[in-house]
């Protein structure tokens, strides 16, 4: 499971001219599911993201988590995080999970966050063409991988 985590001052997701998710201060998370991911990856990834100390404290040090600031989160499924561009010019997505498997893990990831944490979690629509509007705050962008490849 991979995530691109962006600290945002605001973000929104639009599908067919309808805003389906919108937040102020918080995190926008692009989440990719691989063919080897399992349910056990969900808790590691969700707990890591929510507890990352990437928000500034009173001394302007990144020392506060999403929970500390009671920020919001948007999660957007993005299979392209497993695009392999090492050969040729067209990415290969053979490491991405099948849509059926990815949907189950994506939904379970969202449920885990919503059940465990007292934060506003919103989401994009799985397999939809979305327009994601982001005001990256910092900018702060982090890459996470449940297999700890980076």
From Swiss-Prot:
> Which GO terms of type biological process are on file?
D-amino acid catabolic process
List all membrane-crossing ranges. none
- Keyword entries, A-Z: Cytoplasm, Hydrolase, RNA-binding, tRNA-binding
Record carries keyword Hydrolase: yes
Localization terms from the record: Cytoplasm
Against Gene3D superfamilies, the record matches this protein to: D-tyrosyl-tRNA(Tyr) deacylase
Annotated Gene Ontology cellular component terms: cytoplasm
- What domain of life does the UniProt record list for this protein's source? Bacteria
Instruction: Report the residue ranges where the short sequence motif Gly-cisPro motif, important for rejection of L-amino acids is annotated in this entry.
Output: 138-139
Q: Which CDD domains match?
A: Dtyr_deacylase
State the reactions this protein catalyses.
Answer: glycyl-tRNA(Ala) + H2O = tRNA(Ala) + glycine + H(+); a D-aminoacyl-tRNA + H2O = a tRNA + a D-alpha-amino acid + H(+)
SUPFAM superfamilies in the cross-refs: DTD-like (SSF69500)
An MF annotation (GO) of this entry: Ser(Gly)-tRNA(Ala) hydrolase activity
Is Metal-binding one of the keywords?
Answer: no
Query: Anything noted about its domains?
Result: A Gly-cisPro motif from one monomer fits into the active site of the other monomer to allow specific chiral rejection of L-amino acids.
Q: How does it assemble?
A: Homodimer.
- NCBIfam families for this protein: D-aminoacyl-tRNA deacylase (TIGR00256)
Record's family?
Answer: Belongs to the DTD family.
Q: What does this protein do?
A: An aminoacyl-tRNA editing enzyme that deacylates mischarged D-aminoacyl-tRNAs. Also deacylates mischarged glycyl-tRNA(Ala), protecting cells against glycine mischarging by AlaRS. Acts via tRNA-based rather than protein-based catalysis; rejects L-amino acids rather than detecting D-amino acids in the active site. By recycling D-aminoacyl-tRNA to D-amino acids and free tRNA molecules, this enzyme counteracts the toxicity associated with the formation of D-aminoacyl-tRNA entities in vivo and helps enforce protein L-homochirality.
Name the UniProt record assigns to this protein: D-aminoacyl-tRNA deacylase
Annotated organism of origin: Petrotoga mobilis (strain DSM 10674 / SJ95)
Q: Which gene encodes it?
A: dtd
């Amino acid at each position: 499971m991979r995530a691109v985590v962006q600290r945002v001052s605001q973000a929104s997701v639009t599908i067919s001219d309808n805003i389906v998710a919108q937040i102020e201060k918080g995190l926008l998370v692009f989440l990719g599911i691989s063919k080897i991911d399992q349910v056990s990856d969900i808790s590691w990834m969700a707990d890591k993201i929510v507890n990352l100390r990437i928000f500034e404290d009173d001394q302007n040090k990144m020392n506060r988590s999403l929970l500390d600031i009671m920020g919001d989160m948007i999660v957007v499924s993005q299979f392209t995080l497993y695009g392999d561009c090492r050969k040729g010019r067209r990415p290969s997505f053979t490491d991405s999970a099948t849509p059926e498997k990815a949907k189950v893990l994506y939904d379970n990831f969202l449920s885990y966050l919503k059940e465990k944490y007292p934060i506003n979690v919103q989401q994009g629509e799985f397999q939809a063409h979305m327009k994601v509007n982001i005001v990256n705050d910092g900018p702060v962008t982090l890459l996470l991988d449940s297999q700890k490849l980076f």
